[in-house]
């Protein structure tokens, strides 16, 4: 039964990727927007894993297959497939998609038994990063150099606000800590992850942010107790 589930998930991802590739070729949507659709879609897929699979080994195998596919897309000549354009833009070369799959795989191995500890890092990565990137791409006026690249104040503020909203709601529903503590913990986590996102480079925020959130929760286990 697990093998059937694996084939279904793999087929769904391939169809999703082919659809995005078609949209990219049609030039109806901005390349960055398409990348973030892939980002959010991958995150949603990752969030469903604890509800689909019973064995950790199934997701490990699936994750390895995804990594091989993504690496292969980058190796094969882009003129032949055109798939690489879905993963990166002309002005931004990144390995973020590979790091994203690695994050899902890593979080699955260490926290799949605790759905809150597994889900919160992924949701922050999925939504905060995507919204920040889109705001930074289309609406930014104030940019700054981090030493690793260029970021925007608007994008960083968006990352902070989105993370804060996510944390507030998660701790409200999945924790017994008091309201004041929820506000303070959410504020602290939002500030720290925003800083981490700012100083990350080449898509490494897709690794740094979720694992930092996981370690934060692991060191403060009472935050996930209800």
Per-segment meaning from a language model:
Residues 1-11:
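Hydrophobic transmembrane alpha-helical segments in integral membrane proteins
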Residues 3-4, 18-59, 71-166, 173, ...:
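Interhelical loop and helix-boundary elements at the membrane-water interface
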Residues 13-16:
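Glycine/aspartate-rich loop-and-adjacent alpha/beta segment that forms the canonical ThDP
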Residues 63-64:
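Eukaryotic helix-linker segments that join adjacent hydrophobic helices
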Residues 67-69:
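A short structural micro-motif
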Residues 173-180, 226:
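Alpha-helical transmembrane bundle and helix-membrane interface signal
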